[in-house]
């Protein structure tokens, strides 16, 4: 636990030193005036295009807001398979970094000072980090704007995922998709807001590659 405490301390230093612009992005998202049914042909075609993106990377900024603190960081997400993906958080103002790596043995969190923590139970480890259960294995789909097939979600008139809710271990995460990169096909998210009670994650994706 001592090493894990060091990781948390480092992550706080990393985030506080990072760029703050993503924290100023809008968070209020109104439900679309027109909600497209889930069996809409164009929406189903969009889902098929998203499903074909099985290995990809995304880079941008991530911000965290709670009543106690606000911080942000650059992120680099590399996804290969459900059992092989990684997330690196870093600042352009320091050499500190925090990495999450998933392999067949579970999830490992490590920092640039050599501290690390591993656990096969990824949800429990994520709860230790941010205080609530966070399904990191679902993040790959959330980032693409790809909901669960039978999930509770809303589609806007542009055939883009607008909102959804996800239940995990008694916790509820609500996701709102504020902006999309509409200059490419399929349209991929540009700004996502994830909320769980008083905690908010803002994710701005600046670069997609697949």
Swiss-Prot record:
The keyword Transport applies. Its main location: membrane. Residues 1-18 form the signal peptide. A lipid is attached at residue 19 (S-diacylglycerol cysteine). It comes from the Bacteria. InterPro entries: LolA/LolB/LppX (IPR029046), OM_lipoprot_LolB (IPR004565). It is found in: Cell outer membrane. The keyword Disulfide bond does not apply. GO terms for biological process: lipoprotein localization to outer membrane; protein transport. GO terms for cellular component: cell outer membrane. Keywords: Cell outer membrane, Chaperone, Lipoprotein, Membrane, Palmitate, Protein transport, Signal, Transport. A lipid is attached at residue 19 (N-palmitoyl cysteine). It is a lipid-anchor. It holds the Pfam family LolB. Monomer. HAMAP family: LolB. Plays a critical role in the incorporation of lipoproteins in the outer membrane after they are released by the LolA protein. Belongs to the LolB family. This is Outer-membrane lipoprotein LolB. It comes from Actinobacillus pleuropneumoniae serotype 5b (strain L20).
């Amino acid at each position: 636990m001592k090493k894990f405490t060091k990781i948390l301390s480092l992550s706080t230093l990393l985030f506080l030193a990072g760029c703050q612009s993503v924290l100023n992005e809008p968070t209020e998202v109104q439900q679309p005036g027109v909600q497209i049914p889930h069996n809409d042909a164009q929406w189903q075609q969009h889902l098929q295009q998203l499903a074909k993106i099985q290995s990809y990377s995304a880079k941008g900024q991530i911000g965290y807001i709670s009543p106690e603190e606000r911080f942000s960081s650059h992120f680099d997400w590399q996804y290969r398979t459900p059992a092989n993906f990684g997330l690196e958080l870093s600042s352009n103002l320091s050499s500190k970094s925090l990495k999450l790596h998933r392999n067949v043995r579970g999830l490992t969190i490590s920092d640039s000072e050599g501290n690390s923590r591993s656990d096969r139970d990824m949800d429990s480890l994520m709860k230790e980090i941010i205080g609530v259960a966070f399904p990191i294995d679902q993040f790959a789909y959330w980032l693409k704007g790809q909901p669960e097939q039978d999930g509770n979600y809303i589609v806007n008139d542009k055939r883009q995922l607008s909102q959804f809710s996800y239940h995990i271990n008694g916790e509820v995460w609500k996701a709102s998709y504020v902006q999309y990169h509409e200059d490419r096909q399929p349209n991929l998210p540009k700004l996502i807001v994830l909320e769980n009670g008083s905690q908010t994650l803002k994710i701005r994706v600046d670069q997609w590659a697949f």
